[in-house]
Amino acid sequence: MKRSRVPSTSEDSDNGSNSTSWSQHSNSKHRKQSGKRPSEVFRTDLITAMKLHDSHQLNPEDYYELADPWRQEWEKGVQVPVSPESIPQCAVRTVAEKSTAPLFIKPKKLIRSSESSMLGYVGIQTLADGMCRYDLNEEDVAWLQITNEEFSKMGMQPLDELTMERVMEEFERRCYDNMSHAMETEEGLGIEYDEDVVCDVCQSPDGEDGNEMVFCDKCNICVHQACYGILKVPEGSWLCRTCALGIFPKCHLCPKKGGAMKPTRSGTKWVHVSCALWIPEVSIGNPEKMEPITNVSHIPSNRWALICCLCKEKTGACIQCSAKSCRVAFHVTCGLHCGLKMNTILTEADEVKFKSFCPKHSGLDWNEEEGDDDRPVKVPTREDRSRNRGIDFSASSQTRLSQNPEETRLSERKLRVQQLEDEFYRFVAADEVAEHLQLPLEMVDILFQYWKLKRKVNFNQPLIMPKKEEEDSLARREQEVLLRRLRLFTHLRQDLERVRNLTYMVSRRERIKRTLCRVQEQIFHHHVRLLEQGRVTGVSSTRRLEEAMFYFRTTPPVPASPQPLKGHCGQNSTLSSSEKGSNSYRSSKHIEADKPAKMLMDGVPSSGDSVRSETVMSASSRRSEGRTRSGESHRKEEESERPLEDRRRKSKLWDQVSIKDKLRHAKSMEDTLSSETELDTMDDRLLLSHTNANSVATAPNMYSGSPRKTNASHQGKLVPNGTSGRHLKNWGSFRIPKRSERTSAGRQTERQEADNTADQNSSLKTFSTSPSSPQIRTRLRTGSENRRHLEESDLGQSEQGKRCHTQRLPSPMTRRYGSDVIQRGVLAS
């Protein structure tokens, strides 16, 4: 079915024109009226003819099935030329083939430059080739003068120095070239054509097409192309790798030097190709080039430890005999030179197996069994076996027997070389030199005779170094420089590795030290925080913590309610039963007076208040009886001990003050004591008036927030055993008392500290405007509870006095430094 087509717009035009494209079958009135030809024409009948209904019957080869979905833009049709007659026609004509003959080129000899050639514009190689390499010495100049005189007498042309140098250089060049060629051919030594010459790697004397035997022109080793990795035989001379580099290294796997060697991957070690093939752990990186030698480090240590049975040296890596139950070891090169039985077998799976045998098993008639080698092997006779029975197979004797033919060949070769060197003049023809240099034959012949005499005087050695050897020497020097630089960089790299390892270890050590210091700092701050918390919250917890740190004990559990410390005589002094009774009577009166204030602050009475109420009732009855009996005597005692009662009443009020108020009061007390230094003298007088014979130190010491006077006996007074305490200054101000001194010294010190504490509190009361903070917070006990407290305090004070009273440090030092000072002091003692 033919579909009607919607006219396209200007956006569909390829040339960007504003004209509208119409179909060929469309009848547009606009196009007829205008008379203009359309810019584009599309045929839609082709698309319509291509479409077939699915029910249409056609052969499969007559149509193509469209797998892609139909697109709407395909309905536009196929674009056709607007005017096919306007298409240009191509014109073709036959052109004759261009001639390949070269054009005229002007000869260089006809080209002349107006400017003279300068030295800088000439190549260095050209200048080097133009320079004569032979220089006349004084002897040559003297001979030249005598010869020119003879030439003048004979009527010949005199000879100049430059011509003589050129002739001598030509003699040396021709002699070297001809002698080298003679040594390489059968005419000279016949080395290449010797039937006994074998490959240094595979020990085979045969060569094949594409696998020729190549000889080194310097060390004269013979190798196959495939055995040494020679891809292409060079024209002229050929040098092996070691000779090309001008080095004579030692094999890394055997003690031998020389031979067909290849470098390892690093380039610093050299290995025989035969050693690399026979040692199973070693491999070759590129089999075509037969280098580099790899996996040398994979050789086990037990192979390096084997000792060669031929050379008796523990050097390199050895191989072992392939016979069963035979573990005789020998080097690969030693076995090859001694003629041991060493075969390469090609298996059916195209694998090469290497079989090597020791001298004992190499003497067997193995040709009949294997049949792979055509070389005759000497089978020892019965006489030889009987002669050699019981004698060790020494390396020297075997090497002497096996190397006799080779030594003979070497000696013959040396003789031939010596003979060639003696007859060096046979390799130079004077007439050829005269023809080449275009000089008179008589003059060249006279110079030839002089050259022969001078060279014989020089022990047949060349007068100038051959150009090739000179280039090789220069290349060798450059190679040596490169090797030295390589070694230098290798050592530098190793040194840098050592420095890096050292810096890593130092940085790791410093990090560990920093971590340790941080841990110690955290421990120190934790101790300080515990001490500060104990000082703020209460003296008892702080003192118990300090005792645990000072005396190396575990931290005792802190009780819920404050309790008196045992062992500190300055704070818990012993009291007699009569004094305790009077104190309980007077304290009960103050407790009764202070009880309403405490209930107002706390809000709810505690369990201790009930005990205090009972104490007040008993104390009131005792007070009534005491008033009827004594009267005025009790009144006088009350007036004399009123400061003590006021001090106790203020201590009860101090327990009810908050922590912030205590801190504020402690700070104000420190400021007051530090600012009012002029009151120290009055303080000393008041303290001396309350003591009988003991001197009291005037400097106040803060211990956990409370002031304390230091006894003068600790600063230079004699201790109970009569020794001075001044020598204990550098030992932490403590010493371990003797067993006989503990009881008496403890009691005496307790009494002195009790008196000092009382005097201190009275002096602080006199000079302070607010009540001072007590050292401990306790409650007064009455009746049986008070008596039980006295018994416990007596026992605790006696034990502490015996154990650790004299070991206590001053309080400011313990608060600042913690247990570290005590530990050092104990270690030092």
Swiss-Prot record:
Query: What GO molecular function annotations does the UniProt record carry, in alphabetical order?
Result: zinc ion binding
Location(s), subcellular? Nucleus; Chromosome; Cytoplasm; Cytoplasm, Cytoskeleton, Cilium basal body
UniProt zinc finger (PHD-type) residues:
196-246, 306-362
Composition bias type Polar residues, residue spans: 1-10, 394-405, 570-586, 607-619, 697-714
Residue spans of biased composition, Low complexity class: 15-26, 762-774
Q: Which UniProt keywords apply?
A: Activator, Apoptosis, Cell projection, Chromosome, Cytoplasm, Cytoskeleton, Metal-binding, Nucleus, Repeat, Transcription, Transcription regulation, Zinc, Zinc-finger
Which sequence ranges does the entry mark as zinc finger (C2HC pre-PHD-type)? 248-282
- Pfam families xref list: EPL1, PHD_2, zf-HC5HC2H_2
Which SUPFAM superfamilies does the protein's record reference? FYVE/PHD zinc finger
CDD domains annotated for this entry?
ePHD_JADE, PHD_JADE1
Q: Which PROSITE patterns match?
A: EPHD, ZF_PHD_1, ZF_PHD_2
**Partners and quaternary state?**
Component of the HBO1 complex composed.
Say what the protein does.
Scaffold subunit of some HBO1 complexes, which have a histone H4 acetyltransferase activity. Plays a key role in HBO1 complex by directing KAT7/HBO1 specificity towards histone H4 acetylation (H4K5ac, H4K8ac and H4K12ac), regulating DNA replication initiation, regulating DNA replication initiation.
As for family, the record states: Belongs to the JADE family.
Could you identify this protein by its name?
A: Protein Jade-1
